[in-house]
């Protein structure tokens, strides 16, 4: 048998190393090409390391908790063309998925070579987990082509109904331990020590760095959300039927922010030593809460996207975030961040800048309250807006003007159409 190394994937320049989180196979286990063998965690995302071939797991060189670098050998596989189940430690359990009965199309022996060819030919279109699912469920070539085409538009797992257990495997129980079970101090306090994930450590470092290295200030305003609420109520059903996605509030804010950034270019910029660098593009980071912590994937060139495209992108980020499948590249860059504490019920907050960006907009809960309009008291659905910014680059005049610009657009969205 030929030994094949299991390697750490190439990591971006901004990522120096990763931590081995969980081995899904033991030494002696049978592995198949594209099986998820081990999970590793970087400062930003969780990565699945898949088997490069069929064979038997020969050795584990880097155990859970070890720090590894790009292209480092994690373990070795004894490659074989045919894997005998009696040679491995694996127990074979047959499962029946009722959801797949109508969609699964079983292949014949003659079709297997064609399927392998299609998988290889479409390697760049399918992630390891996608290729693994195709093999597990014996999808035939016609259905595979349908999956490849459709997966460009929607979530792959929704098409072939892949078992949900896989997306819930990484729960980080390995990172949780009790330093001393029922450890008690002099005051009889019971404690439980929990090790921080790498993502949480990185978040802590970046937040502290932001506070210590920026002259951060927060300005507040409020916006009447009734026009947007009525707009969603009037066109929401037609929008969903046409675009197959619900229209939320975030796409309105993305559009409003882009227009405001065009009017206040110093907010779409950053400081590089003694220079101010102005962005020409509009890459908007959207804060998303995941089981591992807060991440900010980037909607690139958002100014060229429709409302539907923005909503689909946000939905895709949310699904991938919950499944720990956000790609590293999707988190890199970004000129300006929008965060919505309102989904948790936050009435007001002071969001922290996401360096090297110079500003972040905080959305909050929509709450009906009395407001004086033209000398009359009205009950309106109001939202507080918060703009945290680096005072080294942005003055109070620009920050207030930026918020008022967003407020005016949201209260009269027709401004977007006529560019005012």
Swiss-Prot record:
Keywords: Acyltransferase, Lipoyl, Transferase, Tricarboxylic acid cycle. It catalyses: N(6)-[(R)-dihydrolipoyl]-L-lysyl-[protein] + succinyl-CoA = N(6)-[(R)-S(8)-succinyldihydrolipoyl]-L-lysyl-[protein] + CoA. GO terms for cellular component: cytosol; oxoglutarate dehydrogenase complex. It holds the Pfam family Biotin_lipoyl. Gene3D superfamilies: 2.40.50.100, Chloramphenicol acetyltransferase-like domain (3.30.559.10). Its cofactor is (R)-lipoate. Pathway: Amino-acid degradation; L-lysine degradation via saccharopine pathway; glutaryl-CoA from L-lysine: step 6/6. It is an enzyme of class 2 (transferase). Its EC number is 2.3.1.61. Binds 1 lipoyl cofactor covalently. The keyword Acyltransferase applies. Coiled coil: none annotated. Forms a 24-polypeptide structural core with octahedral symmetry. Part of the 2-oxoglutarate dehydrogenase (OGDH) complex composed of E1 (2-oxoglutarate dehydrogenase), E2 (dihydrolipoamide succinyltransferase) and E3 (dihydrolipoamide dehydrogenase); the complex contains multiple copies of the three enzymatic components (E1, E2 and E3). PANTHER family: DIHYDROLIPOYLLYSINE-RESIDUE SUCCINYLTRANSFERASE COMPONENT OF 2-OXOGLUTARATE DEHYDROGENASE COMPLEX, MITOCHONDRIAL, DIHYDROLIPOYLLYSINE-RESIDUE SUCCINYLTRANSFERASE COMPONENT OF 2-OXOGLUTARATE DEHYDROGENASE COMPLEX, MITOCHONDRIAL-RELATED. Belongs to the 2-oxoacid dehydrogenase family. This is Dihydrolipoyllysine-residue succinyltransferase component of 2-oxoglutarate dehydrogenase complex. The gene is sucB.
